[in-house]
Regions:
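Short acidic/glycine-rich loop or secondary-structure boundary segments that cap or lie
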Residues: 213, 240, 249-251, 469, ...
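An acidic, glycine-rich "communication" segment
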Residues: 113, 485-540
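Glycine/proline-enriched, intrinsically flexible loops and inter-domain linkers
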Residues: 1-425, 438-449
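Conformational gate/switch positions in structured elements
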Residues: 114, 244, 464-465, 531
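Cysteine-nucleophile active-site neighborhood
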Residues: 423-511
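Single conserved hydrophobic/aromatic residue that forms the stacking wall/gate
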Residues: 546-557
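Short, well-ordered, mixed-charge alpha-helical segments that flank or form enzyme active sites
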Residues: 166-168, 189, 467-471, 477-478, ...
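Short gly/pro-enriched beta-turn/loop segments at secondary-structure junctions
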Residues: 198-199, 235-237, 259, 278-280, ...
Length: 557
């Protein structure tokens, strides 16, 4: 039993464009989710093509997730994945809602630089408990028919999915749910991000013909538009692109401007209703050159404003509404105290006593380590000879054999590199403890000291590995020591959660051999992903580290 669906249109409160914009950007389906997104790692594997949020200010949400394939070597082949789903539309009309979910997911892929013909789909379905009510059974059937219609219309297929018909608790039911995930393989060189790139760019809208009976895009028109956008991206004509969805043109233009704080001035004669109309299947393009297709919307501006419908809105004010909505739940703008700018300088050349044309790097891999391949690749790219050694701990004999193998490897190497991850699952109660326990083995400890003090070797660590260096005492003392109450450590972030993002770091001193080719004051943008990234130590030790007073132990920085 399939009931006839109803028509859904969002009703943003207010009369003026400004009133509707403020209500729209503060809507839970539109507002910033950055504080939630940063809890999930977005850079592991060193293959990320698009960060979740684009632009210099990392604020514009991307259309799709894109990363290069994890291969042993270099590649420009990448995979993209995007989703589509509107719970309000699905509640009103399951057939149309599922159809639009497929269209939305595929349109996001096309806007990101992938070809729609290369796409495959997978569905996540979730419906109320069906029981013996025919109208409830009709909801998943209508949704599947709508999704099937979209697959036939686009000529692409779903290759899997997951469904559940248990979305009820007492009197509560989940809304009819069919989330479409579209994925495709493409080239990183074709990938287009969502944020506006510069002022004074022409912005156009590519919109398909709408079927008046269903309110859905005509598939012949939709596929023709996909081809037009794909060809313009191939020719390098597109600077940025955004799929139009839930909040219409207004939402898309607003979010495109956030990442680089670029404004927009509307030239097209658009009504307030048209600005907020959900236009699934439509794509907004920022052009590098004149567009051979599409409707002219307007141009980007240096002034951080949004001008449309005879009104000129302050984008900074809209941005604050957008960011503050979920800030109490998922904070991400917490500022730490100001820190003193520290400067050091290189007083002696950082060169090893014994020159080696191709230094050997041993990379021990512990249970839970997850970035050994990209670490090895980075060393190989720099001219070193990396070797990965897997530490096995299934049996006591395995542990003993791994210790012996690592001892021999350290003897034959000039560098020991501790990669990142979650060694030992970050248990018990903290990171890096499995690695530190392993390196406190007397024989391994002796070999590490010989490498650093007698053979002028080096050690490095990233993430979990760097935590181990600190907890062992190798940073800052240059030797493995027993922990004490005043031993430095890394502790939980002040924001109270894991965070994954890009940050700017400043070189304060280049006395370390690792930074000897850098200049004091150099700024680097680096990826971070950690829950324990705050270095803490006694004030006296901190002063020693910045050479304001004499260190109580030899300091290695």
């Amino acid at each position: 039993h399939i009931e006839k669906g109803t028509v859904w249109q969002p009703q943003w409160a207010g009369v003026t464009f400004e009133q509707k914009m403020k209500n729209m950007v503060g809507d839970l389906n539109v507002c910033s989710k950055k504080g939630l997104s940063e809890r999930f790692d977005s850079t592991i594997g060193a293959a990320t093509v698009l960060m979740p949020f684009g632009g210099a200010y990392q604020l514009t949400p991307q259309n799709a997730m894109v990363a290069k394939l994890p291969v042993d070597g270099e590649t420009s082949t990448c995979s993209g994945m995007a989703w589509g789903y509107n719970p309000y539309l699905m509640s009103a009309n399951q057939y149309v809602g599922a159809r639009m979910a497929v269209i939305e997911s595929v349109t996001k892929l096309v806007a990101t630089g992938f070809r729609y013909e290369d796409a495959y789909l997978t569905f996540q379905e979730y419906f109320e408990r069906l029981g013996n009510k025919p109208e409830r059974w009709g909801k998943p059937l209508a949704a599947l028919l709508g999704a099937l219609d979209a697959q036939i219309g686009l000529g692409i297929a779903s290759i899997g999915g997951k469904d559940s018909m248990s979305g009820s608790f007492e009197q509560l039911d989940v809304p009819p749910t069919l989330v479409s995930f579209a994925t495709a393989i493409g080239k990183a060189s074709r990938v287009v991000s969502t944020e506006f790139k510069k002022p004074e760019s022409t912005v156009v809208l590519v919109r398909p013909i709408i079927d008046p009976e269903t309110g859905c895009p005509n598939f012949f028109s939709l596929k023709a538009n996909y081809k037009i956008v794909e060809n313009m991206i191939e020719e390098g004509m597109v600077a940025s692109a955004c799929s139009v969805g839930y909040g219409g043109i207004a939402e898309a233009l607003f979010k495109m401007g956030l990442g680089n704080r670029i404004g927009f001035k509307m030239r097209a004669d658009m009504t307030t209703h048209q600005m907020f109309e959900p236009m699934y299947g439509s794509i907004i393009l920022e052009m590098v050159s004149d567009s051979p297709a599409g409707m002219l919307l307007g141009e980007t501006t240096k002034e951080y404003t949004f001008e449309s419908c005879g009104e000129k809105l302050d984008m900074a004010e809209l941005q604050e509404i957008w960011e503050s909505k979920l800030e109490p739940v998922y904070p991400y703008r917490k500022a730490g105290p100001a820190v003193e700018k520290i400067n050091g300088s290189l007083t002696a050349p950082a060169a090893p006593k014994i020159g080696v044309a191709k230094p050997k790097v041993i990379i021990p891999v512990f249970p839970g380590t997850n970035c050994e391949y990209d670490t090895a690749k980075a060393f190989a790219r720099a001219g070193a000879d990396p070797e990965i050694l897997v530490v096995r701990n299934l049996t006591p004999a395995d542990v003993a054999e791994s210790c012996e193998a690592l001892v021999k490897a350290i003897d034959a190497s000039q560098i020991v590199m501790l990669p990142g991850g979650f060694s030992g699952g970050d248990e018990p109660d903290g990171s890096g403890k499995f690695i530190t326990a392993f390196f406190r083995n007397p024989v391994i400890k002796e070999k590490v000291h010989a490498l650093l003090k007698e053979r002028d070797g080096l050690m490095a660590g990233i993430c979990n590995g760097f935590q181990a260096l600190i907890k062992l005492g190798l940073v800052p003392y240059g030797e493995i020591i027993e922990p004490s109450a005043d031993t430095p450590t890394l502790t939980f972030n002040t924001i109270g959660r894991h965070q994954s993002r890009l940050v700017n770091t400043r070189v304060a001193s280049n006395k370390s051999p690792w930074l000897s080719s850098s200049n004091v004051g150099d700024i680097h943008t680096v990826a971070i992903s950690h829950g324990e990234g705050r270095f803490v130590c006694p004030k006296e030790l901190f002063l020693s580290l910045i050479h304001i007073s004499e260190p109580t132990r030899p300091i290695s920085i």
